[in-house]
Curated annotation (Swiss-Prot):
Function: Specifically methylates the guanine in position 2445 (m2G2445) and the guanine in position 2069 (m7G2069) of 23S rRNA.
Assigned keywords, A-Z: Cytoplasm, Methyltransferase, RNA-binding, rRNA processing, S-adenosyl-L-methionine, Transferase
EC annotation from Swiss-Prot or TrEMBL: 2.1.1.173, 2.1.1.264
Locations listed in the record: Cytoplasm
Pfam families: Methyltrans_SAM (PF10672), RlmL_1st (PF22020), THUMP (PF02926), UPF0020 (PF01170)
One Gene Ontology cellular component annotation held by this UniProt entry: cytoplasm
Enzyme class: transferase
Record's protein name: Ribosomal RNA large subunit methyltransferase K/L
HAMAP family according to UniProt: 23SrRNA_methyltr_KL
Native source species: Xanthomonas campestris pv. campestris (strain ATCC 33913 / DSM 3586 / NCPPB 528 / LMG 568 / P 25)
Family: Belongs to the methyltransferase superfamily. RlmKL family.
Residue span, THUMP domain: 42-153
Enzymatic reactions: guanosine(2445) in 23S rRNA + S-adenosyl-L-methionine = N(2)-methylguanosine(2445) in 23S rRNA + S-adenosyl-L-homocysteine + H(+); guanosine(2069) in 23S rRNA + S-adenosyl-L-methionine = N(2)-methylguanosine(2069) in 23S rRNA + S-adenosyl-L-homocysteine + H(+)
Length: 711
């Protein structure tokens, strides 16, 4: 069975690792959460033990939902008397996006109406609503016309541990605090005899969470006590009681062995009083020393090694002070130089102000605030002088830098909402700087940023010296804005090689970077060839096909590196078939499938000419993707011209559609003209090009065209 664990953005990979450690058979990170495979007991264990999850959602039903009537009908089909006992209360949380229903509260109300009406039709007592502490809390996820109704097994946000009685201004949520501690390596440091220090501890969230983590206390134990998280009738009470009994035994042993190596201080006496009160309620007051102290007055710790965790002030209510950050960095280097630090800063500029050299940097979200988590190990490694006497950008380079920053700000909300990690940030926005810049963020390891720069061929009338100068200015601007070294910038040119060669090889680094899109890990090669293995412009279309492929058969023609196949597989396609003439691309596709745990007989790879294969094939498919090249010539197949062959190709592809199936056809030939009359003889055809262009490609929306065909 599959269920979903939600979390704050930036915690997905940590949460996936945690859930696997808790016993889930599979956990795949996606936007703001993790798709998990496991039994109900695994989900209930996550409710009790997850330090990172926001909610654990157990699905009851999933259905197409184009409008409010479909939402009501889909919910009303469930036998709600089997889920909600007579006299029990109900509440619904709703999240909607990309759908005709735009108001979450209205969607929640329609679900309540459907549940109540269904129960009343059974002749049973009408359930009442309790938004604060319901017996059954439901969750609606309505995204792009697909609705999922789930039980919130934890009964609400899991960051509420049950110990917070007092707080200072803008407290840190407990699950985000757990992420800061885990990125700092606190569990290992404690096991090795290290200490824990927070010199700006506020109401004590980081230190209390650290103490409970060290004592092996289940996060949900105090929250629920002897109660159960949900009175959903499907909740396994016996299993829950077994989990709680085991957790209490571990709690007893861990608290008894808890060492007094945790220290916190803050300049605000009111915050320290709140921290002491919270620690008392959490049962860890004896293990934590709290005191009123300025950052600069921090004293040397007796432990030779340990971890510093800190969440300095930075949001709209708590003004960020760069001087305070600098004092923090100077003090840590003086007092605990060999310790490890994990600092949650408001942004990269504030992190930089500490003067510390970050070995790793992560993007996290504290509510709606985008933060930079820097990890320094050890603290005392001097940061490289950040261009102490920096070479100022030229006027032209500064123009490019300003445009890049403007575009980043423009795309910020869209990227955060959709979880976009690879995107086009610049595409000849300034005509004299004629290039495209794509950003690729590494999905694993240090989450490094790579830039892929494609220089467009300049007109012959422009002097070569000007072309080189402008390219240098563009590269300098990009490196400064994204803070990347030259070795992480891949430069390509679309000029043809000597002798009219096709896609020439640029470097021979053989460096593979794993990136993520639509919940799938993908291998890209940014340096060695013109193309990287991932066509970013098809991102929306791939997402649509992945959603529609769940439980269905997916065919990918001219599959290239198989990205669409992989995303369909990750989304739950019952089978995928990927066809391409290139053995190199098919191996790349196989590697991508294996990277996502999707290798196996149900994912078929076929090395063949796609058109010839189609005309000989007899199997049927529910979703077909056909993205042919404009031209192709090969010693192993007939020459291919998309304008000449598209009717024949589409006829053969439509013939392979199962009843109710859909074919998505796309190509990049800018002068392409669909023979609508010929195609109408065997298919219904609708151009959907505008719907397949994301904001980062709106500047040049004709980068591809796309159609939806049905038999």
């Amino acid at each position: 069975m599959k269920f979903f664990a939600s979390c704050a953005k930036g915690l997905e990979y940590l949460l996936a690792d945690e859930l696997l450690a808790l016993g889930a058979s599979k956990a795949t990170a996606t936007i703001s959460g993790v798709n998990v495979e496991g039994a109900l007991r695994d989900a209930q264990r996550a409710v009790l033990w997850s330090r990172l999850a926001s909610r654990v959602l157990w699905p009851l039903t999933e259905f197409d939902c184009p409008d409010e009537d479909a939402l009501y009908a889909g919910v009303a089909e469930l036998p709600w008397h089997e889920h909600l006992s007579t006299g029990h209360t109900l509440s619904v949380d709703a999240h909607v996006s990309g759908t005709a229903i735009t108001h979450a509260r209205y969607a929640a109300q329609r679900i309540k109406d459907a549940v109540v009406d269904t129960i009343r039709r059974q002749g049973l007592e009408r359930p009442s609503v309790d938004v604060e502490s319901p017996d059954l809390r439901l969750n609606l996820s309505l995204r792009k016309g697909r609705a999922t109704i789930s039980v919130d097994l934890g009964g609400g946000p899991l960051h509420r541990r049950g110990w917070r009685m007092a707080q200072n201004e803008a407290p840190l949520k407990e699950n985000l605090a757990a992420a800061v501690l885990l990125r700092a390596g606190w569990p290992r440091a404690y096991a090795d005899g290290g200490g824990l220090l927070d010199p700006m501890c506020g109401s004590g969230t980081l230190l209390i969470e650290g103490a409970l983590m060290a004592a092996d206390v289940a996060p949900g134990l105090q929250r629920y006590g002897s109660d159960i998280p949900s009175r959903w009738r499907g909740f396994d009470r016996d299993s829950w009681q077994q989990l709680v009994t085991e957790a209490r035994e571990r709690d007893s042993v861990g608290r008894a062995a808890l060492k007094q190596v945790i220290h916190g201080s803050d300049m605000d006496p009111h915050a320290i009083r709140a921290a002491k009160e919270n620690a008392q309620v959490a049962g860890v007051a004896e293990a934590i020393w709290f005191g009123v102290r300025e950052v600069g007055d921090l004293q040397t710790r007796p432990q030779a090694t340990g971890v510093v965790v800190c969440n300095p002030p930075y949001d709209e209510r708590l003004a960020a002070d760069a001087a305070l950050y600098r004092k923090l960095g100077d003090t840590l280097q003086r007092v605990v130089p060999q310790w490890r630090a994990s600092l949650l800063c408001g942004n990269a500029e504030l992190a930089y102000a500490t003067g510390l050299r970050a070995g790793k940097k992560y993007q996290l979200f504290n509510g709606a605030i985008e933060c930079a988590l820097i990890v320094c190990d050890p603290i005392a490694v001097p940061r490289r002088t950040p261009l102490a006497a920096p070479t100022a950008l030229s006027e032209g380079a500064q123009m490019v830098a300003n445009r890049l920053r403007k575009n980043l700000q423009k795309f910020k909300k869209w990227r955060a909402r959709e979880g976009i990690e690879c995107f086009r940030v610049y595409d000849a926005d300034l005509p004299e700087y004629s290039a495209a810049i794509d950003v690729y963020q590494q999905a694993d390891g240090d989450r490094r940023i790579f830039l892929h720069v494609q220089e467009y061929a300049a007109p012959a009338t422009i002097p070569e010296a000007d072309v080189r100068r402008r390219l240098g200015e563009l590269l300098a601007a990009a490196r400064e804005v994204f803070e990347v070294p030259a070795e992480r910038v891949a430069l390509k040119s679309r000029e043809r090689g000597k002798g009219g060669s096709k896609y020439g090889r640029f470097e021979q680094r053989n460096e593979i970077v794993n990136v993520r899109e639509h919940g799938a890990l993908l291998r890209v090669n940014l340096f060695d060839y013109l193309d990287t293995g991932l066509f970013l412009d098809h991102r929306p279309l791939r997402g649509t096909m992945a959603q529609q492929s769940k439980g269905r058969r997916f065919l990918n023609l001219f599959c290239y590196t198989g990205v669409a196949s992989v995303q369909a597989a990750v989304a739950g396609a019952s089978a995928t078939t990927s066809v391409d003439l290139s053995g190199t691309y098919l191996q790349w596709c196989a590697d991508n499938l294996a990277l996502n745990g999707q290798a196996g007989s149900k994912h078929k790879l076929v090395q063949a000419d796609a058109l010839a294969w189609l005309e000989a094939e007899r199997a049927h498919f529910d979703v077909i993707f056909c993205d042919p090249p404009t031209f192709s010539n090969s010693a192993r197949a007939e020459d291919f011209d998309i304008q000449r062959e598209h009717v024949r190709l589409l006829r053969a592809a439509v013939a392979r559609l199962a009843p109710g199936g859909v074919l998505y056809f796309s190509n990049n030939f800018r002068r392409f003209k669909l023979d609508e009359e010929a195609v109408s003889e065997f298919a219904q055809c609708e151009e959907i090009s505008p719907r397949t262009i994301d904001p980062d490609f709106e500047r040049h929306a004709r980068i591809h065209r796309a159609w939806r065909l049905t038999a």
